[in-house]
Regions:
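Short, well-ordered coil/turn elements that cap or connect secondary structure elements
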Residues: 2, 52-53, 134
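Extreme N-terminal starter segment of soluble prokaryotic enzymes
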Residues: 4-6
Length: 175
């Protein structure tokens, strides 16, 4: 039996653990030849703190209070939240922690009257687009991308990401 996991808003005290989780989770990309992702620096601490201070981050903590996963999100417009990042410590993979973090983001979206949650992810990595599809996310064709999503894509390109390997996805918020 797995230990209970609590999902809660992130605090500044979680920032260092979130960075460690981001680095550890990125190591999976070595398995599929994407070493540049595995070797990338974690999100800048100042940017993490902005998300935390703005109430745009959730963490998953174990029974001992240790952070084992996190999600960053932001409001895109009146109808959409953007799931910026989702990471789970490899030591806690397979326990539905990522799904629970997404459920929390979806609940927040529903509470705020948001119609959908969108994200951008790698198309082929098994723990990326295929995982999100299992959770109900659907792929957005390039023709469906508006200026906001194209701006996100351009930002990713500026970071050195190959957007031909990525896809935008969405999940409509119920209730």
């Amino acid at each position: 039996m797995t230990a209970p996991i609590l999902i809660r808003p992130a605090t500044r005290d979680d920032a260092a653990a979130m960075a460690a989780i981001e680095v550890a989770a990125a190591q999976r990309f070595r398995e599929i030849g994407m070493t540049h992702i595995a070797e990338a620096e974690p999100t800048d601490t100042a940017a993490v703190l902005v998300r935390i201070d703005g109430g745009r981050a959730y963490v998953a903590v174990d029974a001992h209070g240790a952070c084992v996963g996190f999600a960053f999100y932001r409001l895109l417009d009146a109808q959409r939240l953007y799931l910026e990042e989702l990471d789970v410590a490899p030591s806690h993979a397979g326990q539905r922690i990522g799904a629970r973090l997404i459920e929390q983001v979806m609940a927040r979206a529903a509470q705020d009257g948001i119609a959908e949650v969108v994200l951008s992810t790698f198309r082929e990595a098994p723990w990326n687009a295929p995982y999100y599809a299992r959770l109900g996310f659907e792929v957005l064709d390039d023709a469906m991308l508006d200026d906001m999503l194209r701006t996100i894509r351009a930002y990713h390109v500026s970071l050195g990401l190959d957007e031909t390997q990525r896809v935008f996805m969405r999940l409509r918020v119920s209730g």
